[in-house]
Amino acid sequence: MASHSAVIESTISQSEDEWIRQSGGFYACPTCKHDLEPSNDGLSCSVCARIYPILGGIPDFLGGNFAGSGNRSIRVVGNWDSGILFDFMASVYETCIYPAVCNLYGGWHSASLKQLAHDVSDILESRGGLILDVACGPGTYGRRIASASRTVIGIDICLSMMHQGARYVQREHIPNVHFARAMVEELPFRSGLFDAAICAGSLNHFTDVVLALREINRTMKAGAPLAVMCFALIDSGLMKYKSIRDRAERGGGHIYSVADLERRVIEAGFEDFRPHAYGSVLVFSARKGPEEH
């Protein structure tokens, strides 16, 4: 007799497979950007002949070549993903790890996850439609902003986190949150698709922030809002100490000043940069500029 967890996993996989096949037009080949079609093997590109499998209800656009990646995060996560360690981390990420990190870097000025999610939701205003959640983890923010009028599609490189997120979605009865495994630098979506985008907690780990933001920008509609939570060099909070910033850099992170972030955001095609700090935790908004003709 199948265990309760096995039944849940099967239900998640079946419902997501059905949604992927019915959603049509959302996904595009991350390599050649042409539309993908559902097939018996997953999602197929008729132009470059690539096939992307669907693993437990989650399309996998990343593949298995982790060792040769120039992205340190992909090498680390890819080689350890779906092991006992990452499965455990995924199960406690939202209740223990994430709040601890925000409290540590926020210091006396730290904001709760509830407050940060509220800030992100405010940036999106009352906008509905499709929302892109970049480096979504277990849908920490996406699940909190999803609604009857908002469908959230989260991308991450860690399958364990997204499988945990799919379990949360099932348990919390949130029908409008979906996941895909992909890199921010090569998003598997057609251009001008999303009504808004969010990225909470991972901007500091992107190898090339401008490249990542440009790719996010590509997938958004003109005038669409962007909401980001990251860590920054600010006069309050732990990041004001050089030793802490150096340690973050050695671990693959990049700590920017608010001015540096604004410059990169504008360079990537956004405008109207507006920051708000909680210690070294920064929430900022921006908006995609008008389409060039």
What positions do the PLM features span?
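N-terminal auxiliary segments of SAM/dcSAM-dependent transferases
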Residues: A2-I84
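Conserved class I S-adenosyl-L-methionine
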Residues: G25, G56, L62-S126, T140-R144, P225-R250, ...
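Class I SAM-dependent methyltransferase SAM/SAH-binding core
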Residues: L130-E186
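A short acidic, Gly/Pro-enriched loop at the edge of an enzyme's catalytic core
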Residues: E185-A196
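A short SAM/SAH-binding and catalytic strip from SAM-dependent methyltransferases
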Residues: A196-D208
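A short glycine-rich, Lys/Arg-flanked "PGG" loop and its adjoining helix->strand segment in the class I
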Residues: V210-A222
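Short alpha-helix
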Residues: G253-A268
